[in-house]
């Protein structure tokens, strides 16, 4: 049956043509912006709602609650609209206008916390609302249905699309659902694959990626599934994001730039490697933030 949810996943995997190092390594990127709501989070959103339905925990007409920095909220709003749920989303007020508008366009109710409260504050308020009986908290940070989506779809797709040639997998870490699920799948395959996570450097702010305080570390994260964690500076992420657009024709967001910056670093240090990175969303969600402003290109920054 051809319904919207059946268009989620099976995204393209493409090889970078101009940005990779000249040492025999290959850098491939999985274009998750091709999902219907525009990001890798479509996979987790569908999984969290469908699996909860299977367990009888929710049914159409219910109120669902989630804290989000943007992409998960947009994806959940889409699935909620498709299946007939009322979606309440909590988000820091410094996230881009495009993200807010997309959530509201799908009919979601958006509740903003301050920039200072951040994602930690959004998560705390979402939990309080659920405890008051205001709806069912999906809790992407602690919900095993989040990484399950990537264990059953993203991981197998990457293995098939590389014909098992992958040597390194690189992913930005926010909820850690993508890296946890993909790593779990790759660990079960016939050859070792190095798993590399990306987090912002101290003092850097990259939308969608977090350097979590210990007390807020997502419960779904399993450190044994990650071989190395690289720190990425905000400027490196933004410059790589712009390079992807100008030199590869790939229009993506800042966290994707961070992931590819990390992948290029890994490829440069490992001649002959086959490195796969997740390009988790599209660049149109960041236009109002100025990261694609004319000054970056007229001065040559990021090109």
Task: Set out the residue ranges of the language-model regions.
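PLP-dependent amino-acid enzyme catalytic core
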Residues: 1-303
């Amino acid at each position: 049956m051809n319904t919207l949810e059946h268009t989620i996943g099976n995204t393209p995997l493409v090889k970078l043509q101009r940005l990779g190092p000249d040492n025999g390594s290959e850098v491939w990127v999985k274009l998750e912006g091709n999902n219907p709501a525009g990001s890798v989070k479509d996979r987790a959103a569908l999984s969290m709602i469908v699996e909860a339905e299977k367990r009888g925990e929710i049914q159409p007409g219910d109120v669902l609650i989630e804290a989000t920095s943007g992409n998960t909220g947009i994806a959940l709003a889409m699935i909620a609209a498709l299946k007939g749920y009322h979606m309440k989303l909590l988000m820091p007020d410094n996230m881009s206008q495009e993200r807010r508008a997309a959530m509201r366009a799908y009919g979601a109710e958006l509740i903003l916390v301050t920039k200072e409260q951040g994602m930690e504050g959004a998560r705390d308020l979402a939990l309080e609302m659920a405890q008051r009986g205001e709806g069912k908290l999906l809790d992407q940070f602690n919900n095993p249905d989040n990484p399950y989506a990537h264990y059953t779809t993203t991981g197998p797709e990457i293995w098939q699309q590389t014909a098992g040639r992958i040597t390194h997998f690189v992913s930005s870490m926010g909820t850690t659902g993508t890296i946890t699920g993909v790593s779990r799948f790759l660990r079960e395959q016939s050859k070792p694959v190095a798993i590399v996570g990306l987090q912002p450097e101290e003092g850097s702010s990259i939308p969608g990626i977090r350097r979590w305080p210990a007390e807020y570390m997502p419960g779904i994260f399993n450190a044994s599934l990650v071989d190395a964690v690289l720190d990425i500076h905000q400027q490196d992420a933004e410059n790589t994001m712009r390079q992807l657009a100008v030199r590869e024709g790939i229009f993506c967001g800042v966290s994707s730039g961070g992931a590819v910056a990390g992948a290029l670093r890994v490829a440069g240090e490992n001649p002959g490697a086959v490195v796969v990175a997740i390009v988790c969303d599209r660049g149109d969600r960041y236009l109002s933030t100025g990261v694609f402003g004319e000054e970056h290109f007229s001065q040559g920054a990021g090109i």
